[in-house]
Structures are given as C-alpha cells and as structure tokens.
A protein has these predicted regions:
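Metal-dependent phosphohydrolase cores
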Residues: 1-203
Length: 203
C-alpha cells in the first residue's frame, strides 16, 4: 500500500501536537490536553438536562473516598481525551475499541507514574459507579425502566466485591451542579496538581 493510501490513526490535540493512536508515546501525553478535551466532552452522549463534562465527572470521582487512588480516579477516563467518550453499550459491540483504549491508558499510566491497568482497579470502578448513580439521578430524565438499570449497577458493585448499600448521602456530590467547560478544565488541572504533587511526595 502506498504512503498516499495508508490509513492514518493520528489525532491533533489542543496543544497542536499529533498523536498516533496506534503507537502513542508517554512524551505525547500532556495533562493540559487531557483537561481541555475532557472539559469539552459531554457525559451520557450529551443527553443530560444541562451540559455536563467528563472532566467534572472525573474531578468528583477523585473526591469519593479520596484517601484511596484519588489520582487514578481523576485520570480513569483520560483516554477519552484522545478517542472520545463512547458510551458503554457501543464499546461492548467493538472489542477493538477497548483494546486501543487499554493501550492508550497504559501509556497514560507511564506518563504519570501509575500502575498499568489503574483504570480497572475495583476501587476506581466503585467511585465511577457511584458517580454514575448520582449523575443519572440528577441529570437524566426519569424513566420507569430506570429500576432495571439500577439493578444492573448494583450487580456490578457486588461483582467488584462491594456492598450494595451505597453512601450516596456522604460523597458530597448532591445537589449536582454542572460546571461550565472553563471551570471544569481549571478544576481538573488544580486537582491534578494537588494529587500529582502528593503522589511524588510519597515516593
């Protein structure tokens, strides 16, 4: 295949740099790019009452049980800065997407000194599921079929080894007020600065 017809898998980030999604490097990863992109990407494919960003979701996730893996919780969706926020039902239809997502997550882990597979840690997943419940309750239109979804989420908690009883009144996320993108970006960067500095102090 000639160079002219070779399929490219590069994306350009807000900093102007190009990243090869098939061969990303730790040096390609900038926290500013991640914060900018996630602050402009909508959760739930944009079906919330108001715009609600992945960046805000991540910041709030990092505040749940913050003594455990807070930096990992903040960065658990960082891959979406490069491949977008594909909703879970669609991800399940395309195994290749998860493979690419995991590869990029591994590079992000290298860039910030995290364990490979950090985004799959049960504690990180638990915080993500708690935020999912809070967000669905606060930001999505109620539907009689919600009970089916709640049951599925509770089953996920049990599969991860956690109790079904969730401390929703203790996580500091209600009422959930969506932030503007510029506010979400700054909050993400501030939280990263706090957590990344703390992580290096422990090493």
């Amino acid at each position: 295949m000639s160079p002219a017809t070779t399929q490219r898998a590069t994306v350009q980030t807000s900093s102007g740099r190009y990243i090869d999604l098939l061969d990303p490097k730790p040096a390609d990863i900038l926290i500013e790019d991640i914060a900018h992109a996630l602050s402009n990407i909508a959760r739930f494919n944009g079906h919330t009452h108001q715009f609600y960003s992945v960046a805000q979701h991540c910041v709030l996730c990092s505040g749940i049980n913050p003594d455990k893996l807070a930096l990992e919780k903040l960065l658990h969706d960082a891959t979406e800065a490069y491949v977008g926020d594909m909703v879970t039902p669609i991800k399940n239809l395309f195994p290749g997407y998860r493979t690419m997502e995991d590869k990029i997550a591994g590079v992000i882990a290298q860039a910030f000194g995290l364990n490979r597979g950090f985004h799959h840690d049960p504690e990180v997943k638990r915080s993500d599921l708690i935020m999912l419940l809070v967000e669905k309750h606060a930001l999505l239109q109620a539907n009689p079929e919600d009970q089916i979804e709640w049951a599925r989420i509770y089953q996920d908690f049990e599969r991860l080894g956690f109790d079904r009883q969730l401390p929703l009144d203790q996580i500091g996320c209600e009422p959930l007020i969506p932030w503007q993108p510029v506010q979400a970006k700054q909050a993400f960067l501030d939280r990263f600065g706090q957590l990344y500095s703390a992580s290096w102090c422990k090493k």
